[in-house]
Every structure is written in C-alpha cells, then in structure tokens.
UniProtKB/Swiss-Prot annotation:
The lineage of its organism: Bacteria, Bacillati, Bacillota, Bacilli, Lactobacillales. Pfam families: IPPT. InterPro entries: Dimethylallyltransferase, IPT, P-loop_NTPase. The record marks T102, R128 as: Interaction with substrate tRNA. This is tRNA dimethylallyltransferase. The gene is miaA.
Length: 296
C-alpha cells in the first residue's frame, strides 16, 4: 500500500518553524497542521506563538483554535484529529505539512499507532506518557525487571520495547501509516536563546500579560494554564514576584524548554537538522522537499 507523503517540521521554539511551514505551503501547494499541544486552545494566541491572522491568511492552518481552554487535550486526541486533517488535505490534492514542537504528539502519529483494532489506544498512550516520566535509570531498571535486554539502549528504544512487551500482539505487526520527510531547524544555542529573549519581549509588548491575567483570573487550574508562557507570570499576579522577575523566569523556562525539545528530537526521532544560519538555508530544504515529492 502506498503511504501518503507528508512534511514534518520540528525544532526548538522561536527557531522559525512557522515561517518555513508557510513558505513550503506556498511553494508546494500545501496546508499546515499544527503539531503544538497549546495552539489547540482558543483565546490563547500570544503565549502559544500561534500563527497570526496575517500568517493564517497565507496558508490554511489546521488544529488551531479547536478547543476551549477548559477542555483537556492529549496525544490520543491529536492522533485522531491529525489523521482526519491529513485525509482531508490529501483528498483535495494538497500536501500536508505538520509544524510543531510537541514531540510526543508527532511520534504518536508517525510511528504507526492506529486507532482501530483490538488495541486500546488511550491505554497505550497513557502507558507511554507514564514511561516518559521515568528517568533513564528507572527505565532501564524496568527493562531488566521484565527480562528485556537491549544491546544498544536509548530512551526511544527502551520505551518502544516496553510498549511491545505490554501490548505485543497488538503492536508487533503495525507499520507507520505515513511516509514523512522530517525537517529539523536549529542554530547555535546562544543564537536560539537570543531569539527566545527577543520573542518574549515582543510577546509582552503585544499583550501577553493581559492574556495571562485573563487565564489566571478565569481558569487558573486548567490544563491550558500549565503551558510555558502563562504559569511563569502567575507569581506576579499573586504578588509573589515583580514583573521583571516573572519575565526573566519566563525567558529562562523557555530557554530550558528549547534545550529539552532539541534533545528530544535528536534522541527519539530520525531528524536531519538544518541550521537557519547556513547560507544554503532555506534553499537546501526546498530542494530536498522537491526531490522527496518526485520519488515514487
């Protein structure tokens, strides 16, 4: 069976994924699917770095503004929604382009976890999320307790092996449903950190404080409020930190998040990274996409 070709753009926050996605959509007749766990929420526009109205006018975007802030959203929900969006985009002769930094969501979609058959997908994804909370040492101890031996151990292989052990009959014959071209964007760490600092300053100037205050006053305990960009400002509203301190914390936590994102994609998904500072960027990516689409 021929697998549908899709483009997947990943990388740390503030590296330019949205801009590249829009450019590729224009060049290759594509539509964008957000792969970000926070951009599904309505009313949370600035802190989630959601594509602006102008940017959304340049390319059709899917899975943005599809949940109220009071609703929960999971990897299971994303897989369902993304599959429907891909089917819709392909049915109209267009190219699906997934843009986002929520690694667990993308891995769940790309690695063949189908939503039909005997396997309870909610149970599978809940088990994976449980495994993701374990340290490397705890993972390897769990492997040993189940009699699983891996010659070369990394987190991705460890988690996959534990899933197979837990759901062997349902998972062992599944294949990845898509043929993805993985595109990773990166840059020197200090350059990314400077981009993050400038982005936070721009967000604050654009109304992030008011957006965060609304969330704090109306829905302080919902899942959406736990995302980076909001909870760091809550101590200011509670009188526990100055605005300067809260903003500095937001920058620091965003930088740490970007580092975790890079580590996650490098360790757990087969991603080729391109530096946005290279003279060949973005033409080299355009050429790669063109070759990929011409392949049988």
């Amino acid at each position: 069976m021929t697998k549908e070709k899709i483009i997947v753009i990943v990388g740390p926050t503030a590296v330019g994924k949205t801009a590249l996605g829009i450019a590729l959509a224009g060049a290759f007749n594509g539509e964008i699917i957000s792969g970000d766990s926070q951009q599904v929420y309505r009313h949370l526009d600035i802190g989630t770095a959601k594509a602006s109205a102008r940017e959304q006018a340049l390319a059709v975007h899917h899975l943005i503004d599809i949940r109220e802030v009071t609703e929960s959203y999971s990897a299971f929900d994303f897989v369902q929604d993304a599959k429907r969006a891909i089917e819709d985009i392909v049915s109209r002769g267009k190219l699906p382009i997934i843009v986002g930094g929520t690694g667990l969501y993308l891995q769940s979609l790309l690695e063949g976890y189908h939503l039909g058959g005997d396997l309870d997908q909610k149970e599978l994804l809940a088990y994976r999320q449980q495994l993701e909370t374990l340290t490397d040492t705890e993972l390897y101890q769990l492997l040993a307790s189940k009699g699983i031996h891996l010659d070369q151990v990394n987190r991705r292989r460890a988690i996959r092996s534990l899933e197979l052990n837990q759901f062997a009959r349902d998972l062992e014959n599944q294949e990845a449903p898509y043929n993805p071209l993985m595109i990773g964007l990166t840059d020197e760490r200090e350059v990314i950190y400077e981009r993050i600092n400038k982005r936070v300053d721009l967000m604050m100037a654009s109304g992030l404080l008011e957006e965060a205050r609304w969330l704090f006053e109306q829905y302080p305990a919902v899942q959406a409020s736990r995302g980076i960009g909001y909870k760091e400002l809550f101590p200011y509203f509670q009188g526990q930190a100055s605005l300067e301190e809260a903003t500095a914390t937001l920058k620091q936590q965003t930088r740490r998040f970007a580092k975790r994102q890079l580590t996650w994609f490098r360790n757990r998904m087969a991603v080729r990274f391109d530096s946005i500072s290279e003279s060949s960027y973005p033409q080299a990516i355009y050429d790669r996409v063109e070759r990929f689409l011409k392949e049988p």
